[in-house]
Amino acid sequence: MAGYRADDEYDYLFKVVLIGDSGVGKSNLLSRFTKNEFSLESKSTIGVEFATRSLNVDDKVIKAQIWDTAGQERYRAITSAYYRGAVGALLVYDVTRHSTFENVETWLKELRNHTDPNIVVMLVGNKSDLRHLVAVQTEDAKSFAEKESLYFMETSALEATNVENAFAEVLTQIHHIVSKKAMEAASESANVPSKGDKIDIGKDVSAVKKGGCCSN
C-alpha cells in the first residue's frame, strides 16, 4: 500500500504562467484545475495570484505553481516578475472572440522575450462549450501552433473539457525536458576521467582537476 504523501512533498516544482487577453477564462481554467471549481461571475484578476496542485508524472510528484494575471494593458508592468522562472505557459484565447486569437502572437512574443527558449507553451482555445458562437476555427489555431512549435488544445473550463489534459501535457513535457537535461549532465560527468585514465591535453582543464593527478 502506498504511503501517505504530504502536499508539500514533491520531486519537482514547476512554475507555469497563464497568459492571454482579459476575459478569455484564465482564472476559471486555474480554479477548475486546482480546485475543480467554476464561477460564472468571475471578475478580471487584479494584479497577480497563483495556486498549486501536485500531479504524478512518470512516477515523480510534480508540484505545479500556476500564476494568473489580468490581461489588460495596465498590468503589463508586472511582466518581468510574472514571467521570471517560468518553465511552462498556457497561452489562452476565447474561441468566440477572434480578437483574442489575433493578440496571441503579441503575447507569445512577450513571453519569449522574458523566458527561457526551452519553455513549454500550450495554445489553448477556451470556451469550446459555446459551439454556436465559435469565431476562431480549430484549423487556424492548429496551423498557428504548428508554425510556432506550440502544443494546442481546445478547452472548456465550464464543462471541465480538456482542462486536466492541457495542464498535464505541459507538466509532462517540462518533466521530459528536465529529465533529458539531467541525463545529459550525468553522461557528461561520467565522461570525466578517473584516476589512471589518460588525459588529453586538449581537453578542458576542469576535467584534469576532477580526474586528479596520477602520473608517476
UniProtKB/Swiss-Prot annotation:
PROSITE patterns: RAB. GO terms for cellular component: nucleus; plasma membrane; plastid; vacuole. A motif (Effector region) lies at residues 42-50. Gene3D superfamilies: P-loop containing nucleotide triphosphate hydrolases (3.40.50.300). A lipid is attached at residues 213-214 (S-geranylgeranyl cysteine). GO terms for biological process: cell wall biogenesis; protein transport. InterPro entries: P-loop_NTPase (IPR027417), Rab_GTPases_membrane_traffic (IPR050209), Small_GTP-bd (IPR005225), Small_GTPase (IPR001806). GTP binds at residues 20-27, 68-72, 126-129, 156-157. It is a lipid-anchor. It is found in: Cell membrane. Keywords: Cell membrane, GTP-binding, Lipoprotein, Membrane, Nucleotide-binding, Prenylation, Protein transport, Transport. The keyword Cytoplasm does not apply. GO terms for molecular function: GTP binding; GTPase activity. Belongs to the small GTPase superfamily. Rab family. NCBIfam families: small_GTP (TIGR00231). Intracellular vesicle trafficking and protein transport. This is Ras-related protein RABA1c. It comes from Arabidopsis thaliana (Mouse-ear cress). The lineage of its organism: Eukaryota, Viridiplantae, Streptophyta, Embryophyta, Tracheophyta.
